[in-house]
Swiss-Prot record:
Entry keywords, A to Z: Disulfide bond, Milk protein, Retinol-binding, Secreted, Transport
Keyword Secreted on entry: yes
Gene3D superfamilies tied to this protein: 2.40.128.20
Pfam families, sorted: Lipocalin
Secreted found in the keyword field: yes
Function: Lactoglobulin is the primary component of whey, it binds retinol and is probably involved in the transport of that molecule.
PROSITE patterns hit by this protein: LIPOCALIN (PS00213)
Gene coding for it: LGB3
Designated name of the protein: Beta-lactoglobulin-3
Length: 162
């Protein structure tokens, strides 16, 4: 992974529950630049499984309608890193979380590190928090790839709701 692991440990039970995609960033704008872009997904819920994997419930636009998807993130030896199978992305790395307000994560293709990197800022409420957004921006600056923040789902009417 090109994404530095900054989390010492991740308490999966504490990340459980409802989340909202508050901001998105990517190394390649085309991954997110339209409502049908492949990695423009809206996280809804994180559900830890009994085997310490993480089930991610998300929504995205497909064929002019909003659909719900479920992705299984499988644990690795590293507490904040998971293997996933979603398009070409096969790694999910939790950058930072305080469990109660925010969680930052990135998706990466481990076979082509640094080429396609998409990161999201999740929050527990839909209220935009400048402090959290600044923290997310700082977290993005620690990445070895130039990742630009350019999409704020809260400002966009097309946010996918079911």
């Amino acid at each position: 992974a090109t994404v530095p692991l900054t989390m010492d440990g991740l308490d999966l039970q504490k990340v459980a529950g409802t989340w909202h995609s508050m901001a998105m960033a990517a190394s390649d704008i085309s991954l997110l630049d339209s409502e049908y872009a492949p990695l423009r997904v809206y996280v809804q819920e994180l559900r830890p499984t009994p085997r310490d994997n993480l089930e991610i419930i998300l929504r995205k636009w497909e064929q002019k309608r909003c659909v719900q998807k479920k992705i299984l993130a499988q644990k690795t030896e590293l507490p904040a890193e998971f293997k996933i199978s979603y398009l070409d992305e096969n790694e999910l790395i939790v950058l930072d979380t305080d469990y109660e307000n925010y969680l930052f994560f990135c998706l990466e293709n481990a076979d082509a590190p640094g080429q396609n990197l998409v990161c999201q800022c999740l929050t527990r409420t839909l209220k935009a928090d400048n402090e959290v957004m600044e923290k997310f921006d700082r977290a993005l600056q620690t990445l070895p790839v130039d990742v630009r923040l350019f999409f704020d789902p809260t400002q966009v009417a097309e946010q996918c709701r079911i």
